[in-house]
């Protein structure tokens, strides 16, 4: 298994799919990285030389991925909550942010139903 950005990338998959195992790298960004490094999308990661793997590591390191990206997202949410804006309040109350109805739906976000006390 090749290690890129601290993640074990599967050797037996095509490069375009294998790179999506890294948090923050989807299909489009994976295609961009492979085009920049000159690696064909249907090449298996296990068959790449060490030089090509180093080029992939350098290309991936130019983007915010894994821990840095997770930290950035959580800091953005924390900032919204500290500001007290509408989205921050919805995060704080664990409710949907984007205008969905909550009278009957939103069970995933709100959690299981709470019984009515008599």
Swiss-Prot record:
Gene3D superfamilies in the record: 1.10.8.50, 30s ribosomal protein s13, domain 2
Q: Name one Pfam family in it.
A: Ribosomal_S13
Q: Where is this region: Disordered?
A: 94-118
A biological process from GO: translation
Matches recorded under InterPro entries: Rbsml_uS13_C, Ribosomal_uS13, Ribosomal_uS13-like_H2TH, Ribosomal_uS13_bac-type, Ribosomal_uS13_CS
The record's section on SUPFAM superfamilies has: S13-like H2TH domain
Example GO CC term: the record gives: cytosol
Superkingdom of this entry's organism?
Bacteria
Q: Which UniProt keywords apply?
A: Ribonucleoprotein, Ribosomal protein, RNA-binding, rRNA-binding, tRNA-binding
Gene Ontology molecular function, alphabetical: rRNA binding; structural constituent of ribosome; tRNA binding
Q: Which PANTHER family match?
A: 30S RIBOSOMAL PROTEIN S13/40S RIBOSOMAL PROTEIN S18, SMALL RIBOSOMAL SUBUNIT PROTEIN US13M
The record's note on quaternary structure and interaction partners says: Part of the 30S ribosomal subunit. Forms a loose heterodimer with protein S19. Forms two bridges to the 50S subunit in the 70S ribosome.
Quote the NCBIfam families the UniProt record gives.
Answer: uS13_bact (TIGR03631)
Q: What family does the entry list?
A: Belongs to the universal ribosomal protein uS13 family.
Task of the protein: Located at the top of the head of the 30S subunit, it contacts several helices of the 16S rRNA. In the 70S ribosome it contacts the 23S rRNA (bridge B1a) and protein L5 of the 50S subunit (bridge B1b), connecting the 2 subunits; these bridges are implicated in subunit movement. Contacts the tRNAs in the A and P-sites.
- What is the protein's given name? Small ribosomal subunit protein uS13
Which gene codes for it? Answer: rpsM
């Amino acid at each position: 298994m090749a290690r890129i950005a601290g993640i074990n990338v599967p050797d037996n998959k095509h490069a375009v799919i294998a790179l999506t195992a890294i948090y923050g790298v989807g299909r489009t960004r994976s295609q961009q990285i492979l085009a920049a490094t000159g690696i064909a999308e249907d090449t298996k990661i296990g068959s790449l030389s060490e030089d090509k793997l180093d080029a992939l590591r350098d290309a991936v390191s130019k983007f915010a991925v894994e821990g840095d990206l997770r930290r950035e997202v959580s800091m953005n949410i924390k900032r919204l909550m500290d500001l007290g804006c509408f989205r921050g309040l919805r995060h704080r109350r664990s409710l949907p942010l984007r205008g969905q109805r909550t009278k009957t739906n939103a069970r995933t976000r709100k959690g299981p139903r709470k019984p009515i006390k008599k």
